[in-house]
Amino acid sequence: MQLLDGKITSDQIKEELKTKVEAIKAKGGKIPHLAAVLVGDSGAAVTYVNAKVKACELVGFKSTLVKLPETITEADLLAKVAEINADKDIDGYIVQLPLPKHIDEQKVTEAISPDKDVDGFHPTSLGRMVLNLPTYLPATPYGIMQLLERNGIETSGKHCVVMGRSHIVGSPMSILMARNTNPGNATVTMVHSRTKNLKELTLQADILIVAIGKPEFVTADMVKEGAVVVDVGIHRIDDATKKSGFRLLGDVKFDEVAPKTSYISPVPGGVGPMTIASLLMNTLQAAALK
């Protein structure tokens, strides 16, 4: 068993980006600028956004954090989105999800200019991805593709089972893995909460990508010997023995599944850092298009 270490792989990407930014600076070009919109102060969201801002600084990007109160109206948030769309200095931005219940996430996502949609959630971005046209790929699936490619995982002709069908991970992941690209060219099966023969299908997976949002759902008896397992889940579980008061778990029961695998991504330190690296790659692309 080998670890698909997202921290090591994302650090490689950040070093490459840092070199590119230094070259842009040397030529007197525009430094890529990523903005993040944070509504409210939920602990997990603050942690994610701070990690994104820190990563920007590390590679030499300019970053802006827009903090808004949880009580903000939908209209005021949409006005802020329109303002960022019009800001010529900002190359790309994200609106950190989830948003408070009184705000329509889809409406906000669709209000983001596709040119600045570095999270890759806008219908235009997703449509272009399906057609294999140049676009911003959704950050987490893009990060997983990079993790597979940079660790030399063969995907062509393999059976890839994607657990979960969200538009953020599961659906785009299944499309990317089936495309005539490298990585890609896999035979893809998507399973979800209504799948009747779940275990039968997961046991056929050469590559198992798990994004179902249930802590430690995937157990050793669901995974075939030598499979590649990518765990997208991340859950905060209360733990009084930890200084932070919680521990992080994935969707896969790591300790019992890991010995059966050829490669497995840990939680934390697997997909999470790769999502941030992909966001930076998309932002550099956005800046280059200007």
From Swiss-Prot:
GO terms for biological process: L-histidine biosynthetic process; methionine biosynthetic process; purine nucleotide biosynthetic process; tetrahydrofolate interconversion. PROSITE patterns: THF_DHG_CYH_2 (PS00767). InterPro entries: Aminoacid_DH-like_N_sf, NAD(P)-bd_dom_sf, THF_DH/CycHdrlase, THF_DH/CycHdrlase_cat_dom, THF_DH/CycHdrlase_CS, THF_DH/CycHdrlase_NAD-bd_dom. GO terms for molecular function: methenyltetrahydrofolate cyclohydrolase activity; methylenetetrahydrofolate dehydrogenase (NADP+) activity. One of its GO terms (cellular component) is cytosol. It catalyses: (6R)-5,10-methylene-5,6,7,8-tetrahydrofolate + NADP(+) = (6R)-5,10-methenyltetrahydrofolate + NADPH; (6R)-5,10-methenyltetrahydrofolate + H2O = (6R)-10-formyltetrahydrofolate + H(+). It comes from the Bacteria. Its EC number is 1.5.1.5, 3.5.4.9. Pfam families: THF_DHG_CYH, THF_DHG_CYH_C. CDD domains: NAD_bind_m-THF_DH_Cyclohyd (cd01080). NADP(+) binds at residues 164-166, 193, 234. Belongs to the tetrahydrofolate dehydrogenase/cyclohydrolase family. Homodimer. This is Bifunctional protein FolD. It comes from Cytophaga hutchinsonii (strain ATCC 33406 / DSM 1761 / CIP 103989 / NBRC 15051 / NCIMB 9469 / D465).
